[in-house]
């Protein structure tokens, strides 16, 4: 059994609950996390691993609600030095590949495509690392929005120019739009 005591596994889900339960349960196979938590407004789902804590959140009714919650509220569910946020389509499948040196970083996320007109930080530099769908985040990083003013802006700045969709992506906020903070 792999022991990862410094990481809290997190799933935030009000949609696709059966798939979310599968992802959490799979991510807990052969791993002992510092904590594992299923965050939802729908109640503790059936079939959830008994070692996973259920914590109630306000209803997540849109992608903007999800992104807002990740930026400003995930911190309230983490007491370890890091968290691993997973999704129904992005979860742990090879726990033996864990490397404790990853805990030296504030954020590790899957790469975005290489697009010179997208994923730009405030200096116009393309940032490829940041996809939040399966991401390791330090508690220090999660605490930043409560310590400084991190604005909730939609379609502002170079990161959002290519989207023009009225959406706010928490991973883009962390890794590009407000990277300088």
Give, region by region, the residue ranges found by the protein language model:
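N-terminal anchoring/stem segment of glycosyltransferases
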Residues: 1-67, 73-82
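Short beta-strand-to-loop acidic/aromatic patch adjacent to the donor-nucleotide binding site
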Residues: 80-92
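Short glycine-/acidic-enriched loop or helix-start segments at secondary-structure transitions
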Residues: 21, 47-49, 93-97, 146
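Short, conserved loop/helix-junction motifs that constitute active-site signature segments
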Residues: 30-31, 77-78, 99-103, 137
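Short His-Asn-centered micro-motif
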Residues: 12, 39-41, 86-87, 109-111, ...
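Conserved donor-nucleotide/metal-binding helix-loop-beta segment in metal-dependent transferases, i.e.
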Residues: 90-123
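Generic structural signal for small/hydrophobic residues in well-ordered secondary structure
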Residues: 36, 88-89, 138
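Catalytic core and acceptor-binding pocket of nucleotide-sugar-dependent glycosyltransferases
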Residues: 129-181
